[in-house]
Amino acid sequence: MGLRKLKTDEEFKHLIRPLLRKEYLQLEQNLLADGCRDPIVVWHDVIVDGHNRYEICMRHGIPFDTKDMEFECREAAIAWICANQLGRRNITEETRKFLIGMQYESEKVVTRIRNKIGKNQHTVDISSMNDEEADKACRHWTAQRIAEENNVSAATVQ
Protein backbone atom coordinates (compact mmCIF):
# COMPACT_ATOMS: atom_id res chain seq x y z
CA MET A 1 0.00 0.00 0.00
CA GLY A 2 1.14 3.50 -0.71
CA LEU A 3 0.38 6.74 -2.52
CA ARG A 4 1.53 5.83 -6.04
CA LYS A 5 1.25 8.69 -8.57
CA LEU A 6 -1.15 7.62 -11.34
CA LYS A 7 -2.39 9.20 -14.56
CA THR A 8 -5.97 9.93 -15.55
CA ASP A 9 -7.18 9.44 -19.12
CA GLU A 10 -10.19 11.66 -19.78
CA GLU A 11 -11.76 9.22 -22.26
CA PHE A 12 -11.51 6.38 -19.73
CA LYS A 13 -12.91 8.61 -16.97
CA HIS A 14 -15.79 9.71 -19.23
CA LEU A 15 -16.94 6.09 -19.56
CA ILE A 16 -17.62 5.94 -15.82
CA ARG A 17 -20.79 7.53 -14.47
CA PRO A 18 -19.87 10.42 -12.16
CA LEU A 19 -20.97 9.93 -8.58
CA LEU A 20 -23.73 12.12 -7.23
CA ARG A 21 -22.51 14.51 -4.53
CA LYS A 22 -24.15 12.37 -1.84
CA GLU A 23 -22.48 9.21 -3.20
CA TYR A 24 -19.09 10.94 -3.39
CA LEU A 25 -19.36 12.18 0.21
CA GLN A 26 -20.36 8.69 1.36
CA LEU A 27 -17.37 7.18 -0.44
CA GLU A 28 -15.12 9.78 1.17
CA GLN A 29 -16.49 8.96 4.65
CA ASN A 30 -16.02 5.22 4.02
CA LEU A 31 -12.43 5.72 2.88
CA LEU A 32 -11.64 7.92 5.88
CA ALA A 33 -13.17 5.39 8.28
CA ASP A 34 -12.01 2.11 6.74
CA GLY A 35 -9.18 2.98 4.38
CA CYS A 36 -9.14 1.95 0.73
CA ARG A 37 -10.17 -1.71 0.66
CA ASP A 38 -10.46 -2.10 -3.13
CA PRO A 39 -7.40 -1.62 -5.33
CA ILE A 40 -7.25 1.08 -7.99
CA VAL A 41 -7.18 -0.74 -11.34
CA VAL A 42 -4.48 0.57 -13.69
CA TRP A 43 -3.00 -0.08 -17.12
CA HIS A 44 0.52 1.32 -17.54
CA ASP A 45 -0.08 3.68 -14.58
CA VAL A 46 -3.33 4.99 -16.13
CA ILE A 47 -6.45 4.54 -14.00
CA VAL A 48 -9.09 2.31 -15.59
CA ASP A 49 -11.24 1.88 -12.46
CA GLY A 50 -11.19 3.80 -9.18
CA HIS A 51 -10.92 7.44 -10.26
CA ASN A 52 -12.95 8.73 -7.31
CA ARG A 53 -11.16 6.53 -4.76
CA TYR A 54 -7.81 7.68 -6.14
CA GLU A 55 -8.77 11.36 -5.93
CA ILE A 56 -10.02 11.03 -2.35
CA CYS A 57 -7.06 8.90 -1.22
CA MET A 58 -4.54 11.37 -2.66
CA ARG A 59 -6.31 14.35 -1.07
CA HIS A 60 -6.38 12.73 2.39
CA GLY A 61 -3.13 10.76 2.20
CA ILE A 62 -4.94 7.41 2.43
CA PRO A 63 -2.74 4.53 1.24
CA PHE A 64 -4.15 2.32 -1.51
CA ASP A 65 -3.22 -0.77 -3.48
CA THR A 66 -3.21 -0.97 -7.25
CA LYS A 67 -4.07 -3.85 -9.53
CA ASP A 68 -2.12 -3.78 -12.78
CA MET A 69 -4.05 -5.00 -15.81
CA GLU A 70 -2.61 -6.03 -19.15
CA PHE A 71 -4.51 -5.07 -22.29
CA GLU A 72 -3.44 -5.58 -25.90
CA CYS A 73 -4.30 -2.01 -26.80
CA ARG A 74 -6.27 1.05 -25.74
CA GLU A 75 -9.49 -0.34 -27.26
CA ALA A 76 -9.17 -3.50 -25.14
CA ALA A 77 -8.94 -1.29 -22.04
CA ILE A 78 -12.06 0.62 -23.15
CA ALA A 79 -13.95 -2.63 -23.74
CA TRP A 80 -12.97 -3.82 -20.23
CA ILE A 81 -14.09 -0.52 -18.65
CA CYS A 82 -17.45 -0.75 -20.45
CA ALA A 83 -18.01 -4.38 -19.42
CA ASN A 84 -17.04 -3.54 -15.84
CA GLN A 85 -19.42 -0.57 -15.70
CA LEU A 86 -22.25 -2.63 -17.20
CA GLY A 87 -21.97 -4.89 -14.16
CA ARG A 88 -22.94 -2.03 -11.86
CA ARG A 89 -26.48 -1.29 -10.75
CA ASN A 90 -26.32 2.49 -10.63
CA ILE A 91 -26.33 3.22 -14.37
CA THR A 92 -29.22 4.65 -16.34
CA GLU A 93 -30.69 2.86 -19.35
CA GLU A 94 -29.19 5.55 -21.59
CA THR A 95 -25.73 4.99 -20.10
CA ARG A 96 -26.18 1.23 -20.41
CA LYS A 97 -26.92 1.54 -24.14
CA PHE A 98 -23.94 3.87 -24.62
CA LEU A 99 -21.60 1.45 -22.82
CA ILE A 100 -22.85 -1.54 -24.82
CA GLY A 101 -22.19 0.40 -28.04
CA MET A 102 -18.72 1.50 -26.89
CA GLN A 103 -17.83 -2.04 -25.84
CA TYR A 104 -18.93 -3.37 -29.24
CA GLU A 105 -17.00 -0.74 -31.21
CA SER A 106 -13.87 -1.24 -29.09
CA GLU A 107 -14.00 -5.02 -29.34
CA LYS A 108 -14.36 -4.80 -33.13
CA VAL A 109 -11.04 -2.94 -33.24
CA VAL A 110 -9.40 -5.48 -30.91
CA THR A 111 -10.71 -8.36 -33.05
CA ARG A 112 -9.31 -6.74 -36.21
CA ILE A 113 -5.91 -6.37 -34.53
CA ARG A 114 -5.95 -10.00 -33.35
CA ASN A 115 -6.94 -11.25 -36.80
CA LYS A 116 -4.09 -9.35 -38.46
CA ILE A 117 -1.53 -10.96 -36.18
CA GLY A 118 -3.09 -14.41 -36.33
CA LYS A 119 -4.62 -14.50 -32.85
CA ASN A 120 -8.22 -15.11 -33.78
CA GLN A 121 -10.23 -16.13 -30.74
CA HIS A 122 -12.85 -18.04 -32.72
CA THR A 123 -12.71 -21.72 -33.54
CA VAL A 124 -14.24 -21.20 -36.97
CA ASP A 125 -11.59 -21.00 -39.68
CA ILE A 126 -11.87 -17.60 -41.30
CA SER A 127 -8.61 -17.94 -43.22
CA SER A 128 -10.49 -18.92 -46.38
CA MET A 129 -12.68 -15.79 -46.17
CA ASN A 130 -11.77 -12.48 -47.75
CA ASP A 131 -11.19 -9.53 -45.39
CA GLU A 132 -14.74 -8.21 -45.73
CA GLU A 133 -16.34 -11.61 -45.01
CA ALA A 134 -14.02 -12.24 -42.05
CA ASP A 135 -14.72 -8.77 -40.63
CA LYS A 136 -18.48 -9.32 -40.96
CA ALA A 137 -18.26 -12.74 -39.25
CA CYS A 138 -16.21 -11.31 -36.37
CA ARG A 139 -18.66 -8.41 -35.91
CA HIS A 140 -21.52 -10.92 -35.75
CA TRP A 141 -19.77 -13.07 -33.11
CA THR A 142 -18.83 -10.02 -31.06
CA ALA A 143 -22.35 -8.59 -31.20
CA GLN A 144 -23.89 -11.95 -30.30
CA ARG A 145 -21.63 -12.43 -27.27
CA ILE A 146 -22.15 -8.88 -25.95
CA ALA A 147 -25.91 -9.24 -26.49
CA GLU A 148 -26.02 -12.45 -24.46
CA GLU A 149 -23.93 -10.89 -21.66
CA ASN A 150 -26.35 -7.95 -21.41
CA ASN A 151 -29.68 -9.68 -22.14
CA VAL A 152 -30.37 -7.70 -25.31
CA SER A 153 -30.60 -8.66 -28.97
CA ALA A 154 -27.58 -8.64 -31.28
CA ALA A 155 -29.42 -6.02 -33.37
CA THR A 156 -29.52 -3.74 -30.32
CA VAL A 157 -25.76 -4.09 -29.90
CA GLN A 158 -25.04 -3.32 -33.55
Please describe what each predicted stretch is.
Residues 2-3, 13:
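Charge-dense, helix-prone N-terminal extensions
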Residues 4-7, 41, 65-70:
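General small-molecule cofactor/ligand-binding pocket signal
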Residues 17, 42-43:
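A generic secondary-structure micro-motif detector
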